[in-house]
Swiss-Prot record:
The natural substrate for this enzyme may be peptidyl-tRNAs which drop off the ribosome during protein synthesis. Its EC number is 3.1.1.29. It is found in: Cytoplasm. This is Peptidyl-tRNA hydrolase. Keywords: Cytoplasm, Hydrolase. It comes from Pyrococcus horikoshii (strain ATCC 700860 / DSM 12428 / JCM 9974 / NBRC 100139 / OT-3). It comes from the Archaea. The gene is pth. The keyword ATP-binding does not apply. It catalyses: an N-acyl-L-alpha-aminoacyl-tRNA + H2O = an N-acyl-L-amino acid + a tRNA + H(+). GO terms for cellular component: cytosol.
């Protein structure tokens, strides 16, 4: 049986930074947790439905910081919970470098308006 999800979270990573796999995984996790907490505070019903369904997450990529900021503006305009992550700069990249944007959890059809055309990482 195929499970159908109504809610999801999409994490958008900057491919241009060429982060190590471990660093990228940590940044994606920071985004996922931070955006989920935003949803928990501001869109509790979306968070709870997403959590019950199994917490669907999709990781996609962009090639620039500018693209992340444009996507964040679109997410904000649609009222989607989101989180823009800036690295502390302790290891691979300078402090304050924007690494990922997490959008949702929220209804799939709304999230797709922001991230639906992006390629999987």
């Amino acid at each position: 049986m195929i499970k159908m999800f109504k809610y999801k979270q999409v994490i958008v990573a900057r491919a241009d930074l060429k982060l190590s796999k471990g660093k990228l995984a940590a940044q994606v996790a920071h985004g996922a947790v931070t955006a989920a907490f935003e949803a928990y505070k501001k869109k509790r019903e979306w968070f709870e439905a997403w959590f019950r369904e199994g917490q669907k997450k999709v990781v996609v990529k962009v090639e620039s910081e500018e693209e992340l900021f444009k996507l964040k503006a679109e997410a904000e305009k649609l009222g989607l919970p989101n989180a823009l992550i800036r690295d502390a700069g302790l290891t691979e990249i300078p402090p304050g470098t924007v690494t990922v944007l997490a959008v949702g959890p929220a209804p799939e059809e709304i999230v797709d308006k922001v991230t639906g055309n992006l390629k999987l990482l």
